[in-house]
Amino acid sequence: MVMMKIVINGIHANLRFSAAHMIPEHESCGCIHGHSYIVDVKVEGKRSGKHGFVADFKDVKDIVRRICSEFDHKLLIPLRNPLINFTSTTRTVKFEIAGKKYSIPEEDCCLMDLESSSAEELSRYFAATLFKELSSKYDISSVEVCVNEGIGQGAIYTISR
């Protein structure tokens, strides 16, 4: 059976979100700053089902848009980062990084079960979620996601069987 790929260009398919984050102890990214992220996706697999799709574009975009909406206009906070000391996560997210104390309303935050909010970790999260959800419906062999922090600058993660 021949493998095929479908490709979704995030800038044209409107797969984007705007969010703030920080990379603790990084020289220039250690302060809260934001990006207008764009998410590109490639799905590889065997054509299957009634319509002979690798995966329905709509299904792929729906999953990506759901994740984008969770992140959009939020401060992305990785809960498993050892450099972040959390003192509270009830209604107000309180944490400390390198002596700097933060107190942010919970509704303005996206608490993520990740070690970092870097483009690399975000691309891994998108790819893993897509792979898991699409595998239950389609005969896919790999998912590649590029999370761009802006045009021309992104991180790619590929997950495969």
UniProtKB/Swiss-Prot annotation:
Co-factor requirement: Zn(2+)
A Pfam family recorded for this sequence: PTPS
Active site: C29 (proton acceptor), H73 (charge relay system), E149 (charge relay system)
Catalysed conversion reaction: 7,8-dihydroneopterin 3'-triphosphate + H2O = 6-carboxy-5,6,7,8-tetrahydropterin + triphosphate + acetaldehyde + 2 H(+)
Keywords: Lyase, Metal-binding, Zinc
Organism: Methanothermobacter thermautotrophicus (strain ATCC 29096 / DSM 1053 / JCM 10044 / NBRC 100330 / Delta H) (Methanobacterium thermoautotrophicum)
Family: Belongs to the PTPS family. QueD subfamily.
PANTHER family in alphabetical order: 6-PYRUVOYL TETRAHYDROBIOPTERIN SYNTHASE (PTHR12589:SF7), PYRUVOYL TETRAHYDROBIOPTERIN SYNTHASE (PTHR12589)
The protein's annotated pathway: Purine metabolism; 7-cyano-7-deazaguanine biosynthesis
Function description: Catalyzes the conversion of 7,8-dihydroneopterin triphosphate (H2NTP) to 6-carboxy-5,6,7,8-tetrahydropterin (CPH4) and acetaldehyde.
EC number: 4.1.2.50
Classification via InterPro entries: 6-PTP_synth/QueD, 6-PTP_synth/QueD_sf
Binding site for Zn(2+): H21, H33, H35
GO molecular function, one term: 6-carboxytetrahydropterin synthase activity
Further information: The active site is at the interface between 2 subunits. The proton acceptor Cys is on one subunit, and the charge relay system is on the other subunit.
Cofactor note text: Binds 1 zinc ion per subunit.
Entry's transmembrane regions: none
Gene name, Swiss-Prot/TrEMBL: queD
Listed name of the protein: Putative 6-carboxy-5,6,7,8-tetrahydropterin synthase
